[in-house]
Amino acid sequence: MKKLFATLLVLMLEVSGLAMAEEDTSVENILEKGTFILGLDDSFPPMGFRDENNDIVGFDIDVAKEVAARLGVEFIAQPISWDAKELELASGTIDCIWNGMSITPEREESMAMTFPYLNNQMIFYTRADAGIDSLEALAGKSVAVQNGSYAEELLSGDYADLAATFSEVLGFDEYLTALMDLQNGGCDAVLMDLVVGDYRINGMGATDLKAAVALTDDNYGIGFRKEDIALRDKVEELLIEMKKDGTLEKISTQWFGSDITVVPAE
């Protein structure tokens, strides 16, 4: 009987130890260190970018700052290489990736993604006089994307057959450089986010460029480490709270002229 009791005690301690090892302390970790570090591509307006004073600003930045304030911690925006964002997150140098990031099956495999907070479309931008008004018209054309972007994933995955009809797919580190290349005739189209593309073109005063052909709908979400479910859930809870009290509407209206967020109200 004593031997049986000892065996059961060992098993109970092992199970208890395993449970403790798997306990999610991600929210407590943020509160203890006193900072909430957001990883972003700082050339992705209006979600996150550098203003004329070199300060990092944007819609996502304003929302994340409010989340950090409600957590009672300091907000830090940490620029990262978008092509290595998953490595930056896994290494622990940032707490989340929050920068107009599309929700994809691949990203849901490697990260704990939030619910969508903003709807978007992936659009081919062309020169206004190019006469490209359909996907078929892109055959034989050169198309630019940002390295590590959802656009790149689409053309190498679900839309690989379409990409095979292009003369080439060009990779750029920043969309601004890609749009300037398009303007100068270096490529025939740029596949990018509608929200970002329209903002960039308006800011450039590029009346010679236009949103020509839509490829697919898209949703933005926030990515956390797979084990940080509690932190992901807490941020979702705060976003819902901000939707209810009108804070999200206020921030969205400042950047987009109206509330285009899709955060659930409960």
What do these predicted ranges mean?
Residues A84, M101-E109, L154-Y159, M180-N184, ...:
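A ligand-binding cleft/hinge motif common to bilobed small-molecule-binding domains
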Residues E86-G100, E108-Q121, A211:
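Short beta-strand-centered segments that line the small-molecule binding cleft or hinge
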Residues E22-G100, D245:
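Extracytoplasmic small-molecule ligand-binding "clamshell" domains
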Residues I76-L87, V169-N184, T216-D218:
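Short helix-initiation/N-cap motifs at beta->coil->alpha
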Residues T126-V143:
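Flexible hinge/capping segments at coil-to-helix
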Residues D42, L118-T126, A151-L155, L194, D198-W255, ...:
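Periplasmic-binding protein-like
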Residues A64-V73, A151-G171, I201-G205:
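Ligand-binding cleft/hinge of the Venus flytrap
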